[in-house]
């Protein structure tokens, strides 16, 4: 994950990944995250933020797992991002985090928009 993600976006990305990590089948959990996966959710996101962020950047299968959660939890946001639509009522950090995970077209612009409101 680029260090340039705004703090709110990075925090939301890690929260979403942490949530998914807690329910993943053990064999699908990246080796670097197996110990962290056993933590309680809040502790997992707080203490595991750096390795979770690194895994999202380097492990496409793990990011795909997180994207599966995002698609199920935020279908309207995902559809809007897929269509390139504006989301004026949505939290810019949430939108940027979801766009980053999906790597949808224009995700970098969404991150920059979130940076402007933090």
Feature locations, PLM:
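Acidic, low-complexity intrinsically disordered segments
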Residues: 110-118
